[in-house]
Amino acid sequence: MQIVDPAKIAKKYLQRLKESVTRLETNMQVVGFIASDDPPSISYANATRRVFTDAGFNYDLRHVKRLELEAEIIKANADKDVHGIFIYFPVFGNQEDDYLRNLVHYTKDIEAGSLYWTRKLDTNDRSATDIDANKKALIPCTPLAIVKV
């Protein structure tokens, strides 16, 4: 049995991502929302920020109160300069998290965790939209990572 080195696999994909971001005509702005003071969550958020930044994204990690997160997501959805939204879960640890996950507009849902994207995974719908069949649907990151490994 072969031992898989996830860091080696990730390096290949991160390099491709960095090259793609470099070719874009706009600076990609991603906003990450964390509504927790939990040290491991903050550590993960900071590590994620480093990866996004290293890949060439402008990454704005925002610490918000969990009762203000809904309004912040709505503002980020409406902000034409924000291209992607990342939320660090759990926030409430209940169905409210599902609501927040689905509040992110599908065009900014870089985690592909909303029903828009997970439904496409469930139905094997590989197109991002009905309008442009050439744009691939996003796959939530954990299932995608399993497939890639």
Residue ranges and their predicted role:
Residues 3-4, 11, 84-149:
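Anion-binding alpha/beta catalytic cores of soluble intermediary-metabolism enzymes, centered on
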Residues 35-46:
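Glycine- and acidic-residue-enriched helix-capping/strand-helix junction motifs
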Residues 49-64:
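Short beta-strand elements in bilobed, periplasmic/extracellular small-molecule ligand-binding domains
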Residues 1-26:
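Positively charged, low-complexity intrinsically disordered leader regions
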Residues 34-37, 64, 88-90:
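Structural motif
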Residues 25-36:
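Short beta-strand segments enriched in small/hydrophobic residues
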Residues 68-80:
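Short, well-structured alpha-helical segments in soluble
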